[in-house]
């Protein structure tokens, strides 16, 4: 006779990457005064992620930062936000603990009679899924060897906001800041008693005007 027991466990699931194109045309910029587009920086993040049976509904925001020269040769910077929604299909169930990582794979700006900002998003949705595993716990009239196994179980996750500031001496007087782009790269993480620690590196690019030069 064999004895079985059902254990509650968790498993990590990553859906196939989904692509979403976001276009935005602001109406408050005078294109007749735009002489040259210098650069466009884009970042995006998911704000809401809701798991349903067979898919995840994600919503987020794209931030466009545009630097350009006006007809007088003066550099200027503008900042726009565009909201988006996307459906990502996968092996999801309602109630799964899901989250979405957003990567900008491509960006473009078209400046003709109107200004059109475009970003191509890659959405990677992950989830912690609850599962039941049936395991053999005992057997009669058999030679039995036992081995301890560890069953992964999801407990909790937490998001914290960590302020960061730094100062660099550029050797001159900054007339105006046209834009700032920052990227955070995780380097290391470790579990501790009652929490966790993470080591990160931040790369920041600032575009500014100094003595009339960008």
Residue ranges and their predicted role:
Residues 1-214:
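Viral structural modules
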């Amino acid at each position: 006779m064999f004895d079985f027991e059902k254990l509650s466990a968790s498993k990590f699931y990553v859906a196939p990457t989904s692509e979403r194109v976001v276009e935005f045309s602001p109406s408050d910029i005078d294109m007749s005064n735009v002489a040259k587009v210098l650069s466009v920086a884009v970042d995006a993040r998911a704000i809401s992620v809701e798991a349903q049976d067979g898919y995840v509904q994600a919503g987020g925001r794209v931030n466009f930062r545009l630097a350009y020269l006006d007809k007088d040769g003066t550099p200027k910077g503008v900042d726009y936000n565009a909201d988006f929604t996307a459906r990502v299909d996968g092996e999801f169930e309602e109630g799964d603990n899901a989250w979405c990582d957003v990567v900008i794979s491509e960006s473009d700006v078209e400046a003709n009679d109107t200004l059109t900002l475009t970003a191509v998003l890659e959405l990677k949705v992950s989830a912690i899924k609850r599962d039941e595993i049936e395991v053999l716990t005992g057997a009669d009239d058999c030679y039995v060897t036992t081995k301890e196994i560890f069953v992964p179980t999801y407990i909790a996750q937490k998001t914290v906001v960590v302020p960061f500031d730094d100062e660099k001496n550029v050797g001159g007087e900054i007339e105006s800041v046209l834009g700032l782009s920052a990227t955070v790269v995780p380097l290391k993480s470790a579990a501790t008693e009652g929490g966790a620690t993470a080591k990160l590196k931040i790369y920041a690019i600032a575009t500014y005007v100094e003595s009339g030069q960008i």
